[in-house]
Amino acid sequence: MSLFKFAAFVLGTAGSVAGHGYVTKIDVDGTTYGGYLVDTYSYEPDPPKLIAWSTTATDTGYVSPSAYGTSDIVCHRGAEPGALSAETLPGGSVTLYWNTWPTDHHGPVITYLANCNGDCASVDKSTLKFFKIDAGGLVDNSAVPGTWATDELIAADFSRTVTIPSDIASGNYVLRHEIIALHSAGNKDGAQNYPQCINLKITGSGTAAPTGTLGTELYKNTDAGIGVNIWNALSSYAIPGPALYTSGSDSNTATSGASPPSTNFSPTTTAAAATTTLSTVVTSAQSTSATVVAEQTSVSYSQTPWPSSTATEATSASSSAGGSNNGHTGTHDEAGHCPAHTGKKRSRLNRRRMASCSSRTQS
């Protein structure tokens, strides 16, 4: 093994055990609720009651493709339902805030809903059938590895806003929000899923009941959007999972990995400069999310909901296993495409990092 490949392997292994991220708070139509702080609440004898589901992923790690057929993929490892629910209406807005996200963990950000058909606090997660309501994938392919929905999330202070479909029937629902990191997906079992779940009570006069897919059937490790090498130039990317539901039609009948929307590009020679607000170049069916919140507010350990007037600037949460991500190093593919790079927590996607990476790869 060459020194270059060995160094990339060592750095990649270090990145795989370091902390990544999780949802720390949720804003539902202007009311703020606490997320499940896995590196804190897991060690408390009486954690607060939340709308967020608990998990046992104290390493803030991921679910790998080899576990797609297990219950861990539904709402993360060892997930249990939250005791509370946040009320919203069809057309309502939900913003989910992550504590942090490594700049090199590029990939799609996907959100689903599933009707609990009863009380979500006692639902059997293995029975939940999810339909996709929001998805972002490859935004710009002008320079490897491209600009992704995760980069938009970082630029929006680690948040993404989704809109509840305007025709959804009233009821109790689980909202499943997920990042799929693809920095190592060129390797077998290399994709990393980070699902997070919350409970919603949707009221109103909607009547739509979209067809859903069991959590254990959302993805296959052979899906084109799962086994992909982002360190090679991509002309398109198919977001994994069932089709995106659009109000007025039940479009959620496609099988895993076979459904649009995908992102298609024409080759260009000039890369547009990245800004703090990124425009998603996708098909019209995918542009469903509302404008993301530009400033992150506080992370609190109090009971929910939180009064929004008490919000203060957030500090990054540290992983119980890996600590701070302020210099997080990711894993690249074993063929040696671009050595691992680091980035500050609030990086605005400096394009020069990949130009430098490309020049080193060619040397």
UniProtKB/Swiss-Prot annotation:
Positions of disulphide bridges: 75-197, 116-120
Enzyme class: oxidoreductase
Entry note: cofactor: Binds 1 copper ion per subunit.
Residue sites binding O2 per the record: 183, 192
Biotechnology usage: Lignocellulose is the most abundant polymeric composite on Earth and is a recalcitrant but promising renewable substrate for industrial biotechnology applications. Together with cellobiose dehydrogenases (CDHs) an enzymatic system capable of oxidative cellulose cleavage is formed, which increases the efficiency of cellulases and put LPMOs at focus of biofuel research.
Gene Ontology BP terms: cellulose catabolic process
Biological function: Lytic polysaccharide monooxygenase (LPMO) that depolymerizes crystalline and amorphous polysaccharides via the oxidation of scissile alpha- or beta-(1-4)-glycosidic bonds, yielding C1 or C4 oxidation products. Catalysis by LPMOs requires the reduction of the active-site copper from Cu(II) to Cu(I) by a reducing agent and H(2)O(2) or O(2) as a cosubstrate.
Protein name per Swiss-Prot or TrEMBL: AA9 family lytic polysaccharide monooxygenase I
